[in-house]
Design a protein with these regions (language model features):
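Non-catalytic, mostly N-terminal accessory regions of nucleic-acid modification and defense proteins
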Residues: 1-143
């Protein structure tokens, strides 16, 4: 299952003008996977806090959370087909999401925080996927 998904992602990235090698495929797949993992982690922490009567504050602002920009769902749980795609998705990722995540490095309380680590990761990354339609396909496969 996972092997076929990664092969499908590689096939999509192979078609993209911004990804010229297997190293690009790995790097681009990694940042998308990381954001999905981070969203799942925050959801788990939120659930655990609710079960113990505590509150949890997400480190990612609502408008930058996976469920908002990457995989918005309708009330019935199905994918919202009005989600960002094409140039809208690329503009959001390149001009809003990445700059937002890079700022975590300077705004974190210390280097030992997850915020700092997120900022460090995204200060070294660049979205190389040039087609917002290819990026949408990759995001959908990872979701």
């Amino acid at each position: 299952m996972f092997e076929q998904t990664f092969k499908n992602i590689d096939d999509i990235l192979h078609k993209d003008a911004g990804c010229g090698s297997e190293l690009d495929y790995v790097e681009q797949t990694s940042w998308v996977l990381f954001l999905k993992y981070l969203d799942d982690l925050e959801n788990d922490k939120q659930t655990a806090a609710e079960l113990t009567g505590k509150t949890y504050t997400n480190i990612i602002a609502p408008e930058y959370q996976w469920a908002v920009w990457a995989a918005p769902k309708l009330n019935n749980g199905k994918i919202d087909h009005n989600a960002f795609t094409g140039d809208d998705l690329l503009d959001f990722v390149n001009q809003k999401l990445f700059p937002y995540l890079k700022k975590f490095k300077t705004s974190a309380e210390s280097a030992n925080t997850i915020e700092y680590k997120v900022g460090e990761i995204f200060s070294e990354l660049k979205n190389r996927i040039q087609s917002g339609y290819n990026l949408r396909e990759v995001v959908n496969l990872i979701d």
